[in-house]
Amino acid sequence: MFDIGWSELLVIGVVALIAIGPKELPGVLRMVGQWMGKARKMASEFQGQFNEAMREAEMADLKKSFDDIKATANTFSRDNIMTSLQKDVDAAMTIDKIEHIDTSPVEPTTPEPPTAETLLEAETHAASISAATAVTEVGEPLAITQEIHPALPSPEPAAAIAIAPIKDAKAS
């Protein structure tokens, strides 16, 4: 603490013995010891109060940080994506309730096959559009046209086709 070595303490002890005398030396040493005890006690109290103040300041900082995080979390929970997802899931769960509603079944309908008149209209419409604009736009509906089937040759009778004998690869 004071950076005093053993030799320096011995010199102080000899000077105190000569200056104070052997009769009063124990009382003086006791008083010096009490002063040293009081000084150490005051130093430890100061250090304890300083450490407590540091802990309180640190706790105040931690409390402030915690409050900031809590406020941020509250703003996220109000506009939370999970909240909107939960609402979507809840809405999807109501589909089960829709099954209990009495509705008459809808008859499926099939479109009528195209007639010669509708094919002719589609071809004239496609021709007028391709003449008016060279580039076809993406959003335009496709024209209905008649499929052209090539004439299929008549199949030959099965007797005319010569069947080659099947050979076993292992046998040869």
Swiss-Prot record:
Its main location: membrane. Keywords: Cell inner membrane, Cell membrane, Membrane, Protein transport, Translocation, Transmembrane, Transmembrane helix, Transport. Pfam families: TatA_B_E (PF02416). It is found in: Cell inner membrane. The chain crosses the membrane at residues 1-21. GO terms for biological process: protein transport by the Tat complex. Gene3D superfamilies: 1.20.5.3310. Disulfide bonds: none annotated. Belongs to the TatB family. The Tat system comprises two distinct complexes: a TatABC complex, containing multiple copies of TatA, TatB and TatC subunits, and a separate TatA complex, containing only TatA subunits. Substrates initially bind to the TatABC complex, which probably triggers association of the separate TatA complex to form the active translocon. Part of the twin-arginine translocation (Tat) system that transports large folded proteins containing a characteristic twin-arginine motif in their signal peptide across membranes. Together with TatC, TatB is part of a receptor directly interacting with Tat signal peptides. TatB may form an oligomeric binding site that transiently accommodates folded Tat precursor proteins before their translocation. This is Sec-independent protein translocase protein TatB. It comes from Rhodopseudomonas palustris (strain BisB18).
